[in-house]
Amino acid sequence: MSDDEEYTSSEEEEVVEETREETKPPQTPAEGEGDPEFIKRQDQKRSDLDDQLKEYITEWRKQRSKEEDELKKLKEKQAKRKVTRAEEEQKMAQRKKEEEERRVREAEEKKQREIEEKRMRLEEAEKKRQAMLQAMKDKDKKGPNFTIAKKDAGVLGLSSAAMERNKTKEQLEEEKKISLSFRIKPLAIEGFGEAKLREKAQELWELIVKLETEKYDLEERQKRQDYDLKELKERQKQQLRHKALKKGLDPEALTGKYPPKIQVASKYERRVDTRSYDDKKKLFEGGWDEISKDSNEKIWNEKKEQYTGRQKSKLPKWFGERPGKKAGEPETPEGEEDAKADEDIVEDDEEVEEEVVEEEDEEAEEDEEEEEEEEEEEEEEEEEEEEEEEEEEEEEE
């Protein structure tokens, strides 16, 4: 509720009368108007309604006073908050102003310091320039206007370019200051009007543009020269590597800090065979045959050991007599394999001892084996024919 909403006692009485009129019961036919009990009940109802209305009005007044108190407190808090916010904003503005003043003061002090340092440097450079001019004036004016650079034995035989490269940072800075003192002229703008100042500013602007253009051109030229220098160095390194490889040296032998050693003998006359004369003589007298024989024997023994030490395949055992088994042959394929291995070993030993005899024996054995194989084939064919005849007879029966 707002503060403008106020009720007077007359308005409250009107509200009470209206509620009473509304709460009046409808008039019924005068059936029991003369009944005292009925009248008493009606009066009791009216008194109860009046009491309820009074209680409602008192409660409403209490609630309204409570709301007015809360609203008043809220307005007081709002007013206090506005005051504190205004004070805080004022303090913040004051703080910002002080910070800005301090920053401006520090910038002015820094600028003043830089100007003072620059002035001192210029004064020192001017003093040095005056001293140099005075020294030049003191020289003999009748002498030549050029100087001949002579090699000084006390400077380790360095040329002028080498001395220029070996200058320290302080020396270069000093020379830069002196050259700038000659090149930078003071501005004489006292008593100039606006038009002359504009002309002077335009002239200085054109000079700045010209100097920046020259600076950019020189930087680009330096970049190209650095690239060309790197390319030439790499090309020289590759040529030195090829040269070292042709001479039979290490590829990096000629690209190091120090030059390679001088070759005093031809690379084609180097001694590779360090054996003595007696050793070479023995080789030509038959020692080479012995060496080759020993090496062949060694190779043969290694192969023999490899063959005997191989892993043998184990076949499943055969129960019963093998088909095609002859008298004197082993019962199982494993025994036959072992027998064959023993025969091969014996044959190899015989071949090492007597090659010619072994060849003849092998041929005879091959012939015998072929004959045996032929006989076995014939027997198998006969057995097959007999089986076929038996099958035919059975079919006929």
Curated annotation (Swiss-Prot):
Keywords: Muscle protein. Some glutamate residues are polyglycylated by TTLL3B. This modification occurs exclusively on glutamate residues and results in polyglycine chains on the gamma-carboxyl group. Isoform 3 is expressed in the hypoderm. Isoform 8 is expressed in the dorsal vessel. Isoform 6 is expressed in adult TDT muscle and isoform 9 in adult IFM, flight and jump muscles. Residues 1-16, 331-397 have a biased composition (Acidic residues). The keyword Plastid does not apply. Pfam families: Troponin (PF00992). Transmembrane segments: none annotated. GO terms for cellular component: striated muscle thin filament; troponin complex. Disruption phenotype: Flies exhibit 3 distinct syndromes of myofibrillar abnormalities; elimination of thin filaments except where they are bound by electron-dense material presumed to be Z-disk proteins, degeneration of muscles and reduction in the diameter of the myofibril lattice. One of its GO terms (biological process) is mesoderm development. Residues 1-148, 234-261, 294-397 are annotated as: Disordered. SUPFAM superfamilies: Troponin coil-coiled subunits. GO terms for molecular function: calcium ion binding; tropomyosin binding. Residues 37-77, 84-129, 136-148, 294-307, 319-329 have a biased composition (Basic and acidic residues). Belongs to the troponin T family. PANTHER family: TROPONIN T, TROPONIN T, SKELETAL MUSCLE. Troponin T is the tropomyosin-binding subunit of troponin, the thin filament regulatory complex which confers calcium-sensitivity to striated muscle actomyosin ATPase activity. This is Troponin T, skeletal muscle. It comes from Drosophila melanogaster.
